[in-house]
């Protein structure tokens, strides 16, 4: 099978596969991310706001709060979520596996660094980037490379940093950039070092079959269905659960969140659990700071809220060993506590 795949990869007509993939990437990101964010940057510069907090006005009834939040959330992310699933499936059938192994498949730091660099144009939230990371893992991309790509999308999003500078101040944006870069590279490197690949994750996947056993559309259909079924249903359920719990996770009462270590830890942990659209951490923190939240808890929340979430961790349960996901979530929370704790000292 290896020899057959290699001969197919060398066939001259195979160039259309990566070309088609990058065409979909560019067109999709332009429509979903790049063009809308270009206009939003001017809005942020003129008004020092990018909208209302998605957490505002939670209903007292948990079931109604869950439905309300799910409606607002999915209206904001559905285009990016669809694009994420499409790209996560296409990467399994259009990009030669040996390309991925030469770049992102290495367990050395180079793979982690490249995963971070490749994440920058994506600008996706953690849940929309999760299907792409899952597709990469199905092609045997290293844990470090896939984790760096997954976390780098929301944490190092260039558009979010620009919005943050105009809305919260460039000091916040600089801290997020520097601390975020360290967090992404360090966590991905440590997880790669401390967690061993499972035999299941190292084995070839079912959809990686020779052309003779299926054409492009049949193989893409199988990849798309497998990826959708393993990520989207639990994604929807987890968003509903967190929508019901948002009023307890993020208190908005005046003076409720003061500038103390207790609230730094609380906001760091809550940020790791909750799920938000891209850049939604900015109006959330802006609203909570106007209600009296201190700078230290705000920084902790800015670090952890976009980085991971309970739904995205669940979505990747079949792509990474459980230990890798637990470590990632825990180290993101610790990173938020460290950044917030340093703010208390200075």
What do the predicted segments below correspond to?
Residues 33-43, 245-248:
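Membrane-helix interface motif
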Residues 1-23, 39-61, 196-223:
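Intrinsically disordered, low-complexity non-transmembrane regions of multi-pass membrane transporters
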Residues 55-56, 67, 84, 90, ...:
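Transmembrane helical segments that form the transport core of multi-pass membrane transport proteins
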Residues 46, 50, 59-74, 100-104, ...:
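Hydrophobic alpha-helical segments of integral membrane proteins
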Residues 13-39, 106, 111, 168-211, ...:
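Juxtamembrane and boundary regions of transmembrane helices in multi-pass small-molecule transporters
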Residues 119-177, 250-324:
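Membrane-interfacial helix-loop connectors
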Residues 88, 92, 183-191, 242, ...:
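Alpha-helical transmembrane segments of multipass membrane proteins
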